[in-house]
C-alpha cells in the first residue's frame, strides 16, 4: 500500500545516487517495505549483503541506505502535521559545483590508487555519511527531486560533456563525419599494393649538332636569329609604306587646301567689270543662263504651295543669289556652304547688298521679298553636315545610304526641298570616301520628293578626247586641260575615282586640280542613296531645247547670251569650244544620257525617292 506521504504528494520518495558508469548523479525511488515473507532477506546483515554483491555495484550501497529509512505507517489526520515534523527530510541531489568537487575527488582517489579497491572504499557505507552530509548542505539550494526527474540529460548534452573532457586533456573531439565515416576512411587509408611501373625505353643518343649560340638580352634576342639583310629589307618596306601614307594624306589635304586658297585669292571685280571688260564675258553669261534654266525648270515642287528651303553646296561668292530670288516658287531659306572662308565673307556682303537695295522687305518693287540667308564655311564633301547648326534646325537624316536603317532611309529624310551644287562635285571624286560622303550629305538634307540639281564636267567628252589623242592635253587661249600621268587607252576610267587633271580657265580658274566624274559610276552610287536620275544634258543641248522658251528665251537676251537682233550666241569660237567641255547636270530621259560631243559640261537633276 502506498504511504500517506505518497498519497499527499502524489509521488514516491526518491534518493540521489551516484552512478560511476554514467559519471553522474541519478534519482532512485525509495524501495517500500516488503511483506513478512521477505523480511528474512531484508534483515540480513550488511556484511552478508556486501559479500553477495560486487564491489562496484553502487545500487547495493544505495539500497542498504534505503533499508535504514523508517517504515511508512498509517497516520490519523489529526496526527499528520506532527508526524511530518518528526519524519527525516528526503535527501536531495547536490548542486553541480558539489557534484563536480565530489566527482573530482573520487576519480582522483581512484586513479591514484590504481585499483578498483580504492573506488570500492569510496562507495562503502562509511563514505555514504559524507555523501549525505553534502546532500544536507545543498538540499536547500536545489529544486525538488520531482522537478529534476522531469528533465533527463539528453544525448547531445552527454556528447558536449564528453567533448569538454577531451578539450581539457588537449585532444580534439571527433566530428560527426569522422565518426560516421570512420570505417570508410580507414578502408581508404589502408595501403594498397601498386603494380610496378613499366621500365622507360632507353633514350636514343642525341645527334651531334653545333653548339647553340648564346643569346644576349635585348631586342636582338627577342627577334630571333634573322638574317641582317632581311631585317634591313623589312625596315625599308615599313618606312616606304609610312612615307606613302603620309604623302597620300598630305596630297588629300593639299588638294582641299589648294582649292580653298585659290578661290580665296580670286579678286571680287564687280558686276560691271564682268559685263564690259572680262575676256570671257560671253562664256560667263552662257553658264549663268544654264544655271538659271535648271533653277526655273526643277526647283519648284509639284504642289507649288509653300516657300522653298534651299541649301547650296559650294556656293562660292554667292553668284547664284539673284537666280534664286527670281525662282518661280519663292524661297524662304537659303543656306550657302563653301570651304573658302573669304568666299563666304564675300557672299555675306553680296546678300547684305541685296537686302539694302530692295526696300525694307528685301525685295524689288512689286516682286517677292528677299529670302532669309545663312552662310557657313564648311567642307561639304569631306565632312558630315549634321554638325552645322542651321542644317540641324532644318533637318538632316543620318541613316541614308548603305549601312543605315532601311525604314529610316525609306520614309525618313531631311528638311530641304532643293540641294544645288554648281561646278563643284568633281572635287568629291578624289576618292570613293569623299564621293560617298557628298552623296550622304545630299540625300540626308533632302526630304522625300526633293531635287538635287547641278553642273559638272562631262566624262564622255573627256574619254573621247583621251582615246583620240595620245597626248592627254588640249585647250586654247581661254581654257586648258592637262593630265599629269598616263590615261587609259580605251578611254574608260577604272577605278572611277582619283583621276586627276589640272584645269585652267582665263580670269576664273587657275591651274588647280580637278577629278574626272565617270558618269555611270556616279549614277550607280546615287541609286544607293535613293536618288533617281530625271535629267541630264550637255550645255549646248540645253541651249537648243530652251532658247525658244517663252520665259527662258527672253531671259537669255536680258543676260546677254544672244544678240537681240540676230539671235546668235554672243560667245566667241574659243569660248564655245571651252563651253563644250562641260554639260549641265540633270537626270532625265534616255535620249540625253549619253553626251554626243556637244558639251564639255553637262547639267543634271535627281529626285529623292
Curated annotation (Swiss-Prot):
UniProt GO molecular function: mRNA 5'-cap (guanine-N7-)-methyltransferase activity; RNA binding
Site annotation mRNA cap binding: residues: 317, 323, 350, 426, 514, 601
Main subcellular localisation: nucleus
Binding annotation for S-adenosyl-L-methionine: 291, 314, 338, 379, 422-424, 427
Keywords: Methyltransferase, mRNA capping, mRNA processing, Nucleus, RNA-binding, S-adenosyl-L-methionine, Transferase
Comp. bias (Low complexity): 28-47, 70-87
Catalysed conversion reaction: a 5'-end (5'-triphosphoguanosine)-ribonucleoside in mRNA + S-adenosyl-L-methionine = a 5'-end (N(7)-methyl 5'-triphosphoguanosine)-ribonucleoside in mRNA + S-adenosyl-L-homocysteine
Native source organism of the sequence: Aspergillus niger (strain ATCC MYA-4892 / CBS 513.88 / FGSC A1513)
mRNA cap 0 methyltransferase domain mapped to chain residues: 278-590
Compartmental location: Nucleus
Protein role: Responsible for methylating the 5'-cap structure of mRNAs.
Entry annotated with the keyword Nucleus: yes
Family designation: Belongs to the class I-like SAM-binding methyltransferase superfamily. mRNA cap 0 methyltransferase family.
Compositional bias ranges of the Basic and acidic residues kind: 1-10, 148-163, 233-247
Segments for region (Disordered): 1-252
Feature: compositional bias, Pro residues: 193-205
PROSITE patterns: RNA_CAP0_MT (PS51562)
Keyword Transport: no
Stated name of the protein: mRNA cap guanine-N(7) methyltransferase
UniProt-listed PANTHER family: MRNA CAP GUANINE-N7 METHYLTRANSFERASE, MRNA GUANINE-7- METHYLTRANSFERASE
The protein's Enzyme Commission number: 2.1.1.56
Gene Ontology, cellular component aspect: nucleus
Amino acid at each position: 500500500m502506498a504511504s500517506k506521504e505518497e498519497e499527499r504528494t502524489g509521488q514516491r520518495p526518491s534518493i540521489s545516487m551516484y552512478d560511476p558508469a554514467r559519471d553522474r548523479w541519478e534519482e532512485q525511488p525509495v524501495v517500500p517495505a516488503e511483506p513478512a515473507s521477505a523480511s528474512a532477506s531484508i534483515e540480513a546483515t550488511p556484511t552478508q549483503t556486501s559479500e553477495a554483491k560486487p564491489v562496484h555495484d553502487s545500487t547495493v550501497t544505495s539500497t542498504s541506505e534505503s533499508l535504514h529509512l523508517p517504515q511508512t505507517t498509517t497516520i490519523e489526520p489529526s496526527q499528520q502535521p506532527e508526524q511530518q515534523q518528526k519524519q527525516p527530510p528526503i535527501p536531495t541531489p547536490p548542486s553541480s559545483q558539489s557534484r563536480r568537487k565530489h566527482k573530482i575527488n573520487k576519480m582522483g582517489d581512484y586513479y591514484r590508487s590504481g585499483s578498483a579497491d580504492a573506488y570500492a572504499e569510496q562507495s562503502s557505507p562509511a563514505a555514504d555519511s559524507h555523501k549525505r552530509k553534502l546532500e544536507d548542505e545543498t538540499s536547500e539550494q536545489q529544486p525538488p527531486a520531482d522537478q529534476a526527474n522531469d528533465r533527463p540529460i539528453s544525448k547531445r548534452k552527454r556528447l558536449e560533456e564528453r567533448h569538454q573532457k577531451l578539450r581539457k586533456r588537449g585532444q580534439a573531439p571527433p566530428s560527426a563525419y569522422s565518426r560516421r565515416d570512420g570505417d570508410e576512411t580507414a578502408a581508404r587509408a589502408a595501403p594498397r599494393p601498386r603494380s610496378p611501373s613499366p621500365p622507360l625505353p632507353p633514350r636514343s643518343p642525341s645527334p651531334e649538332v653545333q653548339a647553340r649560340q648564346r643569346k644576349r638580352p635585348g631586342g636582338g634576342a627577342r627577334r630571333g636569329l634573322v638574317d641582317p639583310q632581311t631585317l634591313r629589307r623589312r625596315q625599308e618596306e615599313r618606312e616606304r609604306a609610312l612615307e606613302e601614307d603620309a604623302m597620300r594624306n598630305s596630297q588629300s589635304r593639299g588638294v582641299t587646301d589648294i582649292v580653298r586658297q585659290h578661290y580665296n585669292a580670286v579678286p571680287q571685280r564687280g558686276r560691271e567689270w564682268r559685263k564690259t571688260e572680262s575676256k570671257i564675258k560671253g562664256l560667263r553669261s552662257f553658264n549663268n543662263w544654264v544655271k538659271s534654266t535648271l533653277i526655273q525648270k526643277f526647283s519648284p515642287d509639284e504642289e507649288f504651295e509653300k516657300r522653298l528651303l534651299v541649301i547650296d553646296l559650294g556656293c562660292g561668292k554667292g553668284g547664284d543669289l539673284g537666280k534664286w530670288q527670281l525662282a518661280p516658287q519663292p524661297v524662304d531659306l537659303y543656306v550657302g556652304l563653301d570651304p573658302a572662308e573669304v568666299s563666304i565673307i564675300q557672299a555675306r556682303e553680296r546678300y547684305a547688298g541685296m537686302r539694302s537695295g530692295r526696300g525694307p522687305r528685301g525685295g524689288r518693287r512689286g516682286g517677292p521679298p528677299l529670302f532669309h540667308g545663312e552662310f557657313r564655311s564648311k567642307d561639304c564633301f569631306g565632312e558630315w553636315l549634321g554638325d552645322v547648326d542651321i542644317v540641324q534646325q532644318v533637318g538632316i537624316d543620318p541613316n541614308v545610304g548603305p549601312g543605315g536603317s532601311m525604314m529610316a532611309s525609306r520614309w525618313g529624310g531631311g528638311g530641304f526641298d532643293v540641294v544645288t551644287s554648281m561646278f563643284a562635285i568633281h572635287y568629291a571624286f578624289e576618292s570613293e570616301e569623299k564621293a560617298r560622303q557628298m552623296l550622304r550629305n545630299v540625300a540626308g538634307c533632302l526630304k522625300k520628293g526633293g531635287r538635287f540639281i547641278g553642273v559638272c564636267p562631262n566624262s564622255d567628252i573627256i574619254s573621247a578626247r583621251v582615246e583620240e589623242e595620245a597626248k592627254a592635253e588640249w585647250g586654247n587661249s581661254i581654257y586648258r586641260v592637262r593630265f599629269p600621268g598616263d590615261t587609259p587607252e580605251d578611254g574608260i576610267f577604272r577605278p572611277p575615282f582619283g583621276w586627276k587633271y589640272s584645269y585652267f580657265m582665263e580670269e576664273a580658274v587657275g591651274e588647280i586640280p580637278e577629278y574626272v566624274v565617270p558618269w555611270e559610276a556616279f549614277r550607280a552610287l546615287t541609286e544607293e542613296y535613293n536618288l533617281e536620275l530625271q535629267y541630264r544634258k550637255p550645255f549646248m543641248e540645253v541651249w537648243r531645247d530652251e532658247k525658244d522658251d517663252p520665259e527662258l528665251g527672253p531671259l537669255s537676251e536680258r543676260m546677254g547670251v544672244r544678240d537681240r537682233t540676230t539671235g546668235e550666241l554672243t560667245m566667241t569660237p574659243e569660248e564655245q569650244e571651252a563651253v563644250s567641255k562641260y554639260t549641265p547636270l540633270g537626270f532625265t530621259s534616255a535620249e540625253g544620257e549619253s553626251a554626243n560631243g556637244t558639251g564639255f559640261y553637262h547639267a543634271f537633276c535627281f529626285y529623292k525617292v
